[in-house]
Amino acid sequence: MISKLSVNPTFSPSYNIIVDSVLDFSHILEYVTNKQVLVVTNTTVAKLYLTKFLPALVDDLDVRTCILEDGEQYKSQQSLDKILSTLLENHFTRNSTVLVALGGGVIGDITGFAAAIYQRGIDFIQIPTTLLSQVDSSVGGKTAINHQLGKNMIGAFYQPKVVYTSIEFYKTLPQREYIAGMAEVVKYAFISKDFYLWLDSNRDKILAKDSVTLIEMVKRSCQIKAQVVAMDEKELTGARAILNFGHTFGHAIEKCQNYRGLKHGEAVGVGMAQAIDFSHYLGLISQQQAKDFKDFIVSFGISIDFPNDICQKEFLEAMLLDKKNSNKELKFILIENIGSLSLQKQSKNELEQFLDISR
């Protein structure tokens, strides 16, 4: 069973997302028209899937691999340099090269960024192997590496040629990674009331990992993101900002833990709960709504407990570095109801007061 949908960005060429019930890498062959292929993956995924992927490529291709360490802390300049050096050392040229990102969100982000900047842009293909990367980071063209002062601070908007994935990857995906991915899925439920209702009615099948339901879940999640990206590919109008619900708080958590604590999806789960509480603090929603929204998150196995190893001062400083901020104004994606999120400006003092009473 294959589900296919199209992403139509504002400024870039359209591309397909292919969600498969089985794992058949041959689906990407029509997109590998280049003669030089660099497969970028990490140590974990390489052991599981590299020997399955490489034989799917045709014999006349010049195929090389670049294997990075696994973890958010390796979404770094050093890892980027390793990819670029591999390309240069093997004389890969702009018109003959395609990068393949075989892995989760870190691999997709860093490979996409390498593709964006190598010789001013080369083709790349996304093969996301985690739920989180399937429904979020592989779609929409955001590519980046982290800086010691903040997450995703160095990057570019750069779209892939195609996204191919399969729910077969879940067979080797740790449960913690699966639940982390569910946080991004639940985020889309707060953006779309229809999807909220669908998730609510299919919760048991999702938690049981029913194949047909999971394919539909991934497809619907990608459709929601694709619709937003089509309106505002490069965050010029503000429409795309709603995709960052939970991320302002979540990114700060990751930064404070040096990207070695909560996984990205886990931090987003906590971040959504923080954004919900902040919305209640500001009078945008009732206490009952806040409880209902947080209960919905938790019902999918997602923890919303704030880490106890983060001090408020450090957390506030991390939030001040958020990319959405401008002219010393803090910007948050806040919720007024299911399907009603908005980008709002708040003062540093308002945030400090909220953090004081929420700890």
Swiss-Prot record:
Top-tier EC class: lyase
Protein name in the entry: 3-dehydroquinate synthase
Subcellular location: Cytoplasm
Any one GO CC term of the record: cytoplasm
Protein family (similarity comment): Belongs to the sugar phosphate cyclases superfamily. Dehydroquinate synthase family.
Gene responsible for this protein: aroB
GO molecular-function terms, A-Z: 3-dehydroquinate synthase activity; metal ion binding; nucleotide binding
Keywords: Amino-acid biosynthesis, Aromatic amino acid biosynthesis, Cobalt, Cytoplasm, Lyase, Metal-binding, NAD, Nucleotide-binding, Zinc
